[in-house]
C-alpha cells in the first residue's frame, strides 16, 4: 500500500490525476460509509461532501501530512490556489486554514476491503 500511495502522490504533484481518479484509488482499497464531519468552521452532514470525507479519512488512516492531503483534492486544490479570495471549495479552504486539528470525523468513513 505504501508504494501505491507514493505513486499516487507523485502523479498528483505533477497534476496528472483528477479528483475522480483519486476517489477511484481510495475506493479500490476501502469501503466508504457516509460520515458527518467537521472541518474548521464547516460542518458536513453524512449526506454532504463525502468526497472530502473519503479524502480526509484516507489521509488520516495513512498518516499523510496536511500538504499531501491537499494534493489529494487534485484540480479542486489547484482551483483554490488560483483563487485565494474565493469562497468555493470550503472544505479545502478550511483545511488550509485549520489543518488536521480542525478535522473531526464523526465515525469511521472508510473500512479496509
Where are these regions (language model features)?
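Alpha-helix initiation and N-capping motif
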Residues: 2-5, 19, 23, 66, ...
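Long, charge-rich, low-complexity intrinsically disordered regions
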Residues: 2-9, 108-113
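Short, charge-rich, low-complexity alpha-helical interaction segments
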Residues: 11-34, 107
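Short acidic/histidine-centered micro-motifs embedded in hydrophobic/aromatic stretches
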Residues: 25, 29, 72-76, 95-98
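Short coil/turn segments at secondary-structure boundaries
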Residues: 38-41, 108-109
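Amphipathic protein-protein interaction modules
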Residues: 40-90
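Long, compositionally biased
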Residues: 87-113
Amino acid at each position: 500500500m505504501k508504494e501505491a500511495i507514493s505513486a499516487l502522490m507523485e502523479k498528483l504533484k505533477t497534476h496528472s490525476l483528477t479528483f475522480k481518479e483519486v476517489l477511484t484509488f481510495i475506493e479500490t482499497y476501502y469501503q466508504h460509509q457516509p460520515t458527518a464531519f467537521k472541518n474548521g468552521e464547516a460542518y458536513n452532514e453524512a449526506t454532504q461532501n463525502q468526497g472530502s470525507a473519503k479524502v480526509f479519512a484516507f489521509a488520516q488512516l495513512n498518516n499523510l501530512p496536511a500538504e499531501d492531503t491537499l494534493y489529494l483534492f487534485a484540480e479542486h486544490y489547484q482551483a483554490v490556489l488560483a483563487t485565494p479570495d474565493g469562497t468555493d471549495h470550503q472544505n479545502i479552504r478550511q483545511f488550509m486554514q485549520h489543518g488536521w486539528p480542525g478535522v473531526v470525523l464523526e465515525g469511521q468513513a472508510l473500512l479496509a476491503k
